[in-house]
A protein has these predicted regions:
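N-terminal catalytic cores of NTP/NDP-binding nucleotidyl/phosphoryl-transfer enzymes
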Residues: 1-55
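Short beta-strands and strand-loop turn motifs
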Residues: 5-7, 36-37, 68-70, 179-181
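Short, contiguous strand/loop micro-motifs
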Residues: 8, 42-43, 59, 73-74, ...
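Divalent metal-coordination and catalytic microenvironments
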Residues: 14, 59, 166
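Non-catalytic positions within long, well-ordered alpha-helices that form the structural scaffold/packing
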Residues: 25-26, 60, 87-91
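Receiver (REC) domain switch/active-site residues of two-component response regulators
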Residues: 31, 65, 96
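A glycine-rich helix N-cap at a beta->alpha junction
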Residues: 57-71
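Active-site cores that bind ATP or allylic diphosphates and position pyrophosphate for catalysis
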Residues: 69-187
Length: 187
């Protein structure tokens, strides 16, 4: 059975979200589609524009079979913790595929970066700490460490979040296939 997992906020739901749902379903052809959605507060700790029940209802009306709330402790955190909570839930739900939107649109780039970090974790962590000790914020320190390790950076919001999803799946060896859809101006 194919079970598609999407990680969303729908704050508010727009045409890009509908595009994401339709494109993901077209790609995976799932038997069931599940979303993990933030509750009354979204990733940056801001209150959602509309309540979680309204947003869940919109998701169901637009082809989602099941909406699961991402616990508050994860939903208001940085990309890494947001991804940790969402991916763990999807793994427990036995999701077979995850599709996310990204600016780069190339899942192999994310996998390459995630495996490089995993295989050089101690060095990467030390580089991040060093950069933070020099005054960089955590996301910037991670990017600088990545630049030193691989001569690559990930700077756009959806690419950062997508990389966090991929790292989480790879680091825990979850049996989940990862896919990304290139974002357009409409998505």
């Amino acid at each position: 059975m194919k079970v598609l997992g999407l990680i969303v906020e729908y704050n508010p739901f727009h045409q890009g979200h509908l595009y994401h749902i339709n494109k993901a379903k077209q790609l995976i052809k799932p038997d069931v589609t599940i979303v993990i959605m933030s509750g009354h507060f979204v990733q940056r700790g801001e209150p959602a524009i509309s309540n979680k029940w309204t947003r869940a209802g919109v998701a169901i009306k637009n082809g989602i079979d099941l909406v699961i709330e991402l616990p508050f402790v994860y939903s208001v955190q940085s990309a890494d913790y947001f991804a940790q909570g969402a991916i763990e839930l999807l793994a427990k739900l036995k999701v077979t595929d995850i599709v996310f939107g990204s600016e780069c649109g190339n899942i192999n780039i994310f996998k390459d970066i995630a495996f490089t970090i995993k295989n050089n974790q101690k060095n990467y962590d030390n580089l991040v700490k060093k950069q933070m000790n020099q005054g960089l914020r955590y996301p910037d320190a991670c990017n600088q460490a990545l630049s030193i390790l691989m001569n690559k950076t990930v700077t756009t919001p959806n690419d950062l979040l997508g990389l966090a999803y991929v790292k989480e799946v790879i680091n825990h060896n979850y049996p989940i296939e990862l896919h990304c859809i290139k974002r357009t101006n409409d998505f």
